[in-house]
A protein has these predicted regions:
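Alpha-helical adaptor scaffolds
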Residues: 98-102, 128-132, 165-170, 193, ...
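Canonical tetratricopeptide repeat
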Residues: 62, 96, 129, 163, ...
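Helix-start (N-cap) detector for alpha-helical repeat units in TPR-like alpha-solenoids
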Residues: 50, 57, 91-92, 124-125, ...
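Canonical positions in the second alpha-helix
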Residues: 49, 83, 115-116, 149-150, ...
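Residue-level detector of the short coil/turn that links helix A to helix B
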Residues: 71, 104-105, 138, 172, ...
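Position-specific recognition of the canonical hydrophobic site in helix A of tetratricopeptide repeat
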Residues: 68, 102, 135, 169, ...
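Structural marker of alpha-solenoid helical repeat scaffolds
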Residues: 52, 86, 119-120, 153, ...
Length: 391
C-alpha cells in the first residue's frame, strides 16, 4: 500500500473545504501577541524587525478569521493579503486567500482550481492548491512545476519544500525527496509532515529505529488517523511483533484501508502465537459470490479459502483496473504465508515483491526487512537461498 498517494487524495479534499483547509488552520504561533485594537496602528507595513512582522502576521490571520466568520469576506481577503506581505514564507496566507476567493466565486472545485491557476500563474496560493490537485491526480511533473515556481520567488517557504517532498516521495524519487526534506527541517524542524516523510526514507535505508522515532515525534506534534498503521508496521520491521500487534489494534479504520491494518496485525500475532491462534485477527473472509475491494482477497487467501493462483489472478485484474501494484502486494503476502507455514520458497517470493513493489510501499519495506532478517539468521557458509531450500 502507498500511504502517501492515499493521503494525497485527502489533500485534495482539504483544498476543497475552507473549514478543513488553510484558511481555517491553526493560527500561527506568535511570540509577541497583538490585540485587535492595537495591531492596525502597529502593522502598517513590514519592517526589518522579523519578530514584529511575525506578530503582525498572526494578528492579521486572526483578524481575517473574525471578518470571515462575520461574513465580511472582502475584509477577510484584505487581511490575508496583508498577512502574506508580513510573512511571505508562510504560504498559509496565500493559500487561504486563494481558497476563500475561489469559494466566494463558487469555483472551489478541481476545474475551478485548474482554471484559476492557469489564469494567474504568479499566484503562490493558487499554485500550491494546483500542486495538491496534481499530486492527487498523480501528475507529479505538474505538481513539481507549480512548486518550483513558488520556490523561485519564496525559497524559504517550508510548505513549498514540503509539497515538493511529498511529490518526490509519491513518484518515487527518494534522492530528490531527501534534499527536499532536509530543506524543510532546516526551516521548520518540527514539521510533522516532513518528519513522517523522513521516517519513510529511514525505513527504506534500514534505519527502523530512526524511522520509528520520526513517526512517534510527528504523532506527538500532530496526530494523524494513519499513524498507528505507520508506527505499527515499522515496529514489525524492527521485529517488535508484540508492540506492532498492540499498535495496529488501535482505531482500525473501515475497509479497504483497515484491511491492511488487520493483515499486518495478523502477521505480527502469527509470529508470536502461530497462524491458527492469530487467524482471528484477520476477521471474516469474503462471503461466497461477493466481490470486495483489494486487499480483501488477501484475507481469503490467508484463511485458506482461495489458493495462490486465484489470489494472483484477482491481483492482476485489480491492478489492471486501478494501476496500484496489487500483484507485488500479493507476492509479499504469499511470501509471509509461506514463511509462517514453512512451505514453498518464501525467499523467492520476498525477492519478487522487493523487485516489483514501488519503494514507497509498505510491502516493499516488509520484503526487504524479511530478506535482511533471513540473511542474518542463515547458517554460516550458506546463502539465504540455501537456507530456504533446506526447509
Amino acid at each position: 500500500m502507498n500511504v502517501f498517494l492515499r493521503a494525497a487524495t485527502a489533500l485534495l479534499a482539504t483544498s476543497l473545504s475552507l473549514q478543513a483547509g488553510a484558511a481555517d488552520a491553526a493560527a500561527p504561533a506568535a511570540s509577541t501577541p497583538a490585540s485587535a485594537a492595537s495591531f492596525q496602528d502597529k502593522c502598517q507595513a513590514p519592517t526589518v524587525d522579523r519578530a514584529a512582522n511575525r506578530a503582525c502576521a498572526v494578528a492579521l490571520w486572526r483578524h481575517a478569521e473574525v471578518e470571515r466568520t462575520a461574513g465580511r469576506n472582502d475584509a477577510a481577503l484584505a487581511a490575508l493579503a496583508r498577512g502574506d506581505q508580513f510573512s511571505p514564507d508562510d504560504l498559509r496566507f496565500a493559500m487561504a486567500h486563494a481558497s476563500l476567493s475561489l469559494k466566494l466565486a463558487s469555483q472551489l472545485t478541481p476545474a475551478g482550481i485548474e482554471a484559476a491557476a492557469k489564469a494567474s500563474p504568479g499566484d503562490a496560493g493558487l499554485a500550491m492548491m494546483h500542486a495538491e490537485l496534481s499530486i492527487a491526480k498523480r501528475d507529479f511533473a505538474a505538481a513539481l512545476a507549480d512548486v518550483d515556481g513558488v520556490l523561485a520567488k519564496r525559497p524559504d517557504a517550508p510548505l513549498a519544500w514540503e509539497m515538493r517532498a511529498t511529490a518526490d516521495v509519491a513518484r518515487p524519487d527518494f534522492a530528490a525527496a531527501r534534499t527536499d526534506i532536509d530543506q524543510v527541517l532546516r526551516l521548520e524542524p518540527r514539521s510533522p509532515v516532513s518528519l513522517r516523510l523522513r521516517g519513510l526514507m529511514r525505513n527504506n535505508s534500514g534505519d527502523y529505529a530512526g524511522a520509528l522515532a520520526d513517526y512517534q515525534a510527528a504523532r506527538a506534534l500532530a496526530p494523524r488517523p494513519e499513524d498507528p498503521f505507520i508506527i505499527g508496521s515499522t515496529q514489525f520491521l524492527q521485529r517488535q511483533f508484540g508492540d506492532a500487534a498492540a499498535t495496529l489494534a488501535t482505531r482500525t479504520p473501515p475497509a479497504p484501508d483497515g484491511t491492511y491494518w488487520r493483515l499486518w496485525r495478523y502477521l505480527a500475532l502469527a509470529r508470536l502465537e502461530g497462524v491458527e491462534r492469530a487467524s482471528g485477527a484477520l476477521g471474516p473472509g469474503t462471503p461466497p459470490g461477493t466481490g470486495v475491494p483489494w486487499p480483501g482477497p488477501v484475507v481469503d487467501f490467508l484463511h485458506g479459502s482461495i489458493d495462490a493462483a486465484t489470489l494472483l489472478d484477482i491481483a492482476r485484474k485489480s491492478q489492471e483496473a486501478h494501476d496500484v501494484s496489487q500483484v507485488c502486494e500479493a507476492h509479499f503476502y504469499m511470501a509471509e504465508d509461506a514463511l509462517l507455514r514453512q512451505h514453498g520458497d518464501a525467499i523467492a517470493l520476498f525477492r519478487q515483491a522487493a523487485s516489483e513493489c514501488p519503494r514507497n510501499f509498505h510491502e516493499y519495506e516488509g520484503a526487504v526487512s524479511e530478506l535482511k532478517a533471513a540473511a542474518a539468521t542463515a547458517p554460516a557458509g550458506t546463502t539465504v537461498s540455501d537456507a530456504s531450500a533446506a526447509r
